């Protein structure tokens, strides 16, 4: 069910992990998108308008939008659309132009209550690591005057989009979904070597732990498969 169900049989239906844990992650996404200062401005306006009142999710999101002069109408789908989105990523590196392209595609599987799904607003925080494990400076080709960042938060709001980073001196290792930037499944075809590299070098603690866990699970899966088929353990 979505964070804010359209109906319920009894009030206990609201005391679920979806409402409380996913709901909290959706609020945290706003901070990721708006920045800490922008989120604080929205929270101040929300309290100024509604302190002591009975309010709704719509009142909260409206205060965030008004304080930051931005449109959050599509973001509101997080409250009404059920299911866990999957973001599939593909990358390519052009040595001649020194550009790195990241392509992202989102899809939310049909659920029992909702067959048709609409694109959500998904913040995707990424980093690029060089061969020594250092974070590269990130600037998008279409934002040449932007201040370089070690972690860049991209916004995936359509079904698919792509971003091109400039002045990338070598083929980097992608650190995808830093800080668990959205409650989605990030799908990217990491090799065992890339996972080991991220586990040892990624500056983002969440992704470093995630890479180590995936690496261990992959190794265990291979060992179990080998044992079942009577092969030598890898």
Label for each model-derived stretch:
Residues 16-17, 166-234:
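Long, ordered, helix-rich scaffold segments
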Residues 48, 122, 199:
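Conserved short-loop catalytic and cofactor-binding motifs
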Residues 51, 111-114, 222-223:
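A generic structural signal for short coil/turn motifs at secondary-structure boundaries
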Residues 71-74, 84-176, 208:
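Beta-strand-rich binding/interaction modules
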